């Protein structure tokens, strides 16, 4: 059993990551699964806004669950979707998308597989 209690075994603080307008807290799943999965709490950096760049992620699995605040993503062929507390989303591998905007109090959980993956900027659809 791996237990992320925030008291020292796992990272109990937020750090920078993929996007400059977010902070990330590693929940220890990457280490516990030897890189097969990653789970992070992601929160907005107040005053920093999304850079709505179209991109894809090269991974097998990506899901988000909104804890507080809201976030709007735009997905190719589906348009804009706003996620609010309690919303969960499974993003299919390789779907072209971009974050449009988010609230300053946004906090979500993201689970990916594998833990490390490539993000590629792509042309607008």
Whereabouts are the PLM-identified features?
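A short, N-terminal "cap"/entry segment at the start of jelly-roll beta-barrel domains
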Residues: 1-46, 120-125
């Amino acid at each position: 059993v791996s237990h992320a209690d925030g008291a020292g075994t796992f990272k109990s603080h937020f750090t920078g990551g993929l996007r400059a307008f977010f902070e990330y807290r590693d929940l220890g799943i990457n280490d516990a699964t030897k890189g097969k999965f990653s789970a992070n709490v992601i929160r907005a950096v107040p005053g920093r806004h999304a850079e709505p760049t179209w991109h894809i992620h090269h991974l097998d699995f990506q899901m988000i669950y909104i804890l507080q605040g809201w976030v709007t993503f735009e997905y190719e062929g589906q348009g804009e979707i706003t996620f609010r507390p309690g919303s969960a989303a499974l993003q299919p591998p390789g779907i072209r998308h971009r974050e449009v905007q988010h609230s300053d109090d946004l906090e979500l959980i993201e689970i990916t597989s594998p833990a490390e993956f490539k993000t590629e900027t792509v042309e607008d659809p």
